Amino acid sequence: MSIQIKQSTMVRPAEETPNKSLWLSKIDMILRTPYSHTGAVLIYKQPDNNEDNIHPSSSMYFDANILIEALSKALVPYYPMAGRLKINGDRYEIDCNAEGALFVEAESSHVLEDFGDFRPNDELHRVMVPTCDYSKGISSFPLLMVQLTRFRCGGVSIGFAQHHHACDGMSHFEFNNSWARIAKGLLPALEPVHDRYLHLRLRNPPQIKYTHSQFEPFVPSLPNELLDGKTNKSQTLFKLSREQINTLKQKLDLSSNTTTRLSTYEVVAGHVWRSVSKARGLSDHEEIKLIMPVDGRSRINNPSLPKGYCGNVVFLAVCTATVGDLSCNPLTDTAGKVQEALKGLDDDYLRSAIDHTESKPDLPVPYMGSPEKTLYPNVLVNSWGRIPYQAMDFGWGSPTFFGISNIFYDGQCFLIPSQNGDGSMTLAINLFSSHLSLFKKYFYDF
């Protein structure tokens, strides 16, 4: 699909901002490699009624000048987003130098319908998300890049490339919410807090009470038929309606030892875990891990993180089972394992995890660092259920679609709630193509 870049602007903060280095925690640094950005896409379909398009300050649908001006103002309180990475000794920092965030304006001769259901893939990412040149070193590229793409049908997309060292998904969308509010002439809803050293530094003395095996180096154990590099991976979307989710929950064995009500995420994540293990054709004795990124904001409470904390507070919950147990035991047991793993991430555990990471001079990037780009035999289920995408109204209405632009790792998936509030959810997943049809069979077999 063709795309034409019309203009690229390095947007700097509208006012003078603190010129300093921002200390990053090890939690900031271990989720992704430093030479990578996370891509996400918002889709806005132009309303049929022109009166629904009218912004109080412009008659143009998604006026780039308004977006750029608002972005410049949003970068004042969120000034680290306009900085660059640098290395200080054995760790990364953000040089808050106000060099700016990249804003790209692009056009495409295609219509939004050409992208179908907007499933993540290389083409969607290439057309809608800004690309980055990492060849000039760690301090050469922006931490935030945004692309406004106009399509022949009148609709637009806003693609984000956000650096994970700068912040996690929740902080990123709090920033986007502030940007959107400023574009409408409103004040930001939150005042960001950037001091990570104050809140996530090593305790004195360290209190490491758990093993924290989730931070150990990960080496995928691929079978021979997947080692030749010729087996393709496929990314696709699977939708679960509210009725299907309710049917899945009705399969739970209420007479089991699970005493606490299981959440929708726990049930669906457990179901995905089982379905992937079956689809891969693993032997019954093999172990498969379910890895779940968890927002620690509500779990850290001694002391609590301040509202508006801008940084990474993502921790990994991990549960392990054999393929035989996943296949033979009821879904209630599997979902119960998920619940137990999530409950284990309390304040005591997370503070111990922080001390563990800060005590290590060098930590690998867990799970997201293998050159084969696979989590095999494991699976990672990330929930985007609490990301406030509907707040991304820049003055021309809320997005009609929100999703990840590209999933790079086999076994990685995202659970995204419906945009229209009908109680459904979509699973975006990357699997080896040879496993995909069986996964679909098991995923809908309930």
Curated annotation (Swiss-Prot):
Domain of life the protein comes from: Eukaryota
Annotated pathway: Phytoalexin biosynthesis; methoxydianthramide B biosynthesis
Active-site residues from the entry: H164, D393
Keywords: Acyltransferase, Flavonoid biosynthesis, Transferase
One example of a Gene Ontology biological process annotation: flavonoid biosynthetic process
Post-translational modification: N-terminus is blocked.
Catalytic activity line of the entry: anthranilate + benzoyl-CoA = N-benzoylanthranilate + CoA
Keyword Acyltransferase: yes
Molecular function terms, GO-annotated: anthranilate N-benzoyltransferase activity
Expression triggers: By fungal elicitors. Elicitation triggers a rapid, transient induction, reaching maximal abundances within about 0.5 hours and returning to basal levels within 4 hours.
Pfam families, sorted: Transferase
InterPro entries (UniProt xref): CAT-like_dom_sf, Plant_Fungal_Acyltransferase
The keyword Chloroplast is annotated on this UniProt entry: no
Family label: Belongs to the plant acyltransferase family.
Task performed by this protein: Catalyzes the formation of N-benzoylanthranilate, in the course of methoxydianthramide B, a phytoalexin. Phytoalexins are produced in response to infection by parasites, and are essential for the expression of disease resistance.
PANTHER family noted in UniProt: SHIKIMATE O-HYDROXYCINNAMOYLTRANSFERASE (PTHR31642:SF11), TRICHOTHECENE 3-O-ACETYLTRANSFERASE (PTHR31642)
UniProt-recorded name of the protein: Anthranilate N-benzoyltransferase protein 2
Origin species: Dianthus caryophyllus
